[in-house]
Regions:
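Ser/Thr-rich, Pro/Gly/Ala-heavy low-complexity intrinsically disordered linkers and tails
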Residues: 1, 6-62, 67-68
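Extracellular carbohydrate-recognition regions
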Residues: 51-94
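Beta-strand-rich interaction surfaces with strong enrichment in secreted/lumenal proteins
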Residues: 67-68, 132-138, 239-246
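Carbohydrate-binding surfaces in secreted/extracellular proteins
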Residues: 82, 252-311
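Extracellular glycan-recognition surfaces and repeat-rich motifs
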Residues: 86-122
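Secretory/extracellular carbohydrate-interaction modules
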Residues: 107-231, 358-361, 366-375
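Trp-centered recognition loops
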Residues: 141-143, 149, 239-258, 268
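Flexible glycan-contacting loops in extracellular carbohydrate-active proteins
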Residues: 285-360
């Protein structure tokens, strides 16, 4: 049972039918005010960047070995190595019940790291918990790269949903919009999720997203594979070139995500990912070749009876207005009691002994307008 399937992505059987989840990042108990809190989009931000901003050659880390001086590079929109404690995120501003900036001998670099821990007991008391530092970037941009080093501790359920990247106009908030289609002239977002199999996926909401109701992604009653109810949970894209067996736990992983808005009126938006500096997948115009089935794009095609012949991916039409730009990052470890317990039970069925808590460590987080590369 893969968590990414158990959690709210419709899992198709050989006939093309699916089981539908009912909750997707509910109004959770979080460690910070929501992104629509007063002051988040206050005046004073720098003017939006444009594609005409000329990038430098090479990776940012090549110009800043050991991340030395990286925070001051003009391409950098956000930087936190946690060495100076809290203060760089909009919220929280201090440790919480689930988030801790701490000195550690396993910190990726330097002496300190961020730890996000949610326990089974805490979930019994509050069945939706988000351990979610958030930050509004120094300016909204059309092309964004985010690099972080993460470490999944021990054998434990992974988050129901993980890191969120939000784009929008000045007034758009991506919170509390599960099972909705966001307006193209207001905003969109995606999560970077980790399954129980320790593989990653994009989980995207945008105004051209597909429904899980029908095989072809529409929501027309009586369609082929009709599920009988209309729903719009995130569309799933699993980068195809990840390591067999997934990532290693109890080791630092370098993750970098690239995201690009579309030209208004075109489908040339893209999402891409690197793990430990190795490209593992890009979803953009013409790549990869694969098959849509309901609300999931299958790189290389799929084998269910409802699957059609693979074709090149069409690209993303994320937005319909120019002022919809990438603006906010949530380092969100979001858990639900029901999926946490099902994942724990699945681990037990595999002969494993999961912990009674889920912990992820973070270090060396950077957002920029250029490729960053892993810290070295």
């Amino acid at each position: 049972m893969v968590l990414g399937l158990v959690a709210l992505v419709a899992a198709c059987d050989a006939s093309g039918t699916a089981d539908v989840g009912t909750i997707d990042r509910a109004d959770a108990s979080v460690d910070a005010p929501g992104p629509d809190a007063p002051g988040l989009d206050a005046p004073g931000l720098d003017a939006p960047a444009s594609r005409d901003d000329a990038p430098s050659t090479g990776l940012l880390r090549d110009r800043h070995p050991g991340d030395e001086g990286l925070a001051d590079d003009p391409a950098v929109l956000f930087f936190d190595d946690f060495e100076s404690g809290w203060g760089r995120w909009d919220a929280p501003s201090a440790d919480t019940a689930h988030l801790f900036v701490e000195t550690s001998d396993v910190a990726h670099a330097g002496a300190r790291q961020l730890r996000a821990t949610v326990t089974h007991d805490q979930l019994r008391d509050d069945m939706y918990i988000g351990a979610a530092p958030r930050v509004l970037l120094s300016r909204p941009v059309p092309d964004l790269y985010v690099r972080l080093h993460a470490r999944f501790v021990g054998i434990a359920p992974n988050p129901h949903h993980w890191i969120r990247f939000a784009a929008g106009d000045a007034g758009f908030s991506s919170s509390g919009l599960a099972n909705t289609v966001p307006p193209g002239d207001q905003g969109f977002w995606f999560d970077w999720d980790a399954s129980l199999e320790n593989t990653f996926s994009f989980y995207a909401y945008w105004f051209r997203m597909r429904s899980g109701r029908c095989n072809d992604g529409t929501a027309v009653p009586g369609c082929a594979g009709d599920q009988g109810t209309t729903y719009y949970y995130g569309n799933t894209f699993v980068p195809p070139d990840q390591a067999e067996g997934g990532f290693e736990r109890d080791q630092w992983i370098c993750l970098e995500l690239g995201m690009h808005v579309n030209t208004v009126g075109e489908s040339d938006g893209a999402l891409e990912a690197w793990i430990d500096d190795v490209p593992v997948g890009r979803f953009g115009p013409g790549e990869p070749v694969g098959t849509w089935l309901r609300d999931r794009f299958h790189p290389g095609g799929c084998s269910f009876s409802a699957c059609t012949e693979p074709v090149p991916f069409e690209g993303f039409e994320f937005r319909s207005e120019e002022d919809v730009l990438f603006k906010e990052l949530f380092l969100d470890s979001y858990y639900q009691l029901d999926t946490w317990e099902r994942s724990r039970d699945e681990l037990v069925s595999r002969g494993l002994t999961p912990m009674e808590s889920s912990t992820i460590l973070y270090d060396d987080v950077v957002a920029a307008t250029e490729r960053i590369g892993c810290r070295r």
